[in-house]
Amino acid sequence: MSVPARVVTLLVAFALVALGAVYVVAHFVVGTLPTVDYTHAASGGVVNVVLQETPENDSSSKPDWVSYYVMKPGANPFQPSSWVHTTLLSVPANTRVNMTVYGYDGCTPPRNNLWSEVQGTLGGVMSFRQFLNANKPKGPTFVTSTLNGWSHCAVGHTFAIPSLGLFIPVASPDASASLCATAPCVAGPYSLEKFSFRTPPHGGDFRWQCFVPCGGGFEFGTGGPMQTIGYMSGQMAVVGA
């Protein structure tokens, strides 16, 4: 077989493997997780989405993995039954998304301090506030375009949708705080973070994930929960009219 023919054969084989991986993720991983539907919760072109990130989770297979949870629309964030262990959610197209993130996990310095910068939000900023416990603030609310994870222990994870140019550092509780020990977290110290962005005018599926090396026990911290849907990686379905 000639060299060009071998190259073509290898490229075709690689493409088939890649397509197979996409099929497995789409049909076996995503297909087994529930999707929290926020499309019917939108009003006046606005929808409020609530997440939390935790130092552990309530699964039987990987309970020690850090994870995101999605709250049911309009639920009470301090009731365990309000939270769904999934990273799949759906929102309407051409809608302002007001996102709230309850950060219960400790800090992990980002590998690149680019992830300390707020990118793609409306106004280019986000707000955060530290809490000692449910609705017990520790200090004032800060509005910022940067949460420097290198100068001090401040960033727990990130929420990023690369295809929308959206990257937000998620604040961690105070470095001396005792972290939540039972997920979903409804008590203990946390950071409360808020930011807004607009969904595209068309429907589609958009991958989101954390870019902080939060995969403890894996090489470079980038494996395990960081790349697994249902933990620190997820999908936002934008539903067109």
Task: State each model region's role.
Residues M1-G149, I161, G240-A241:
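Extracytoplasmic entry segments of secretory-pathway proteins
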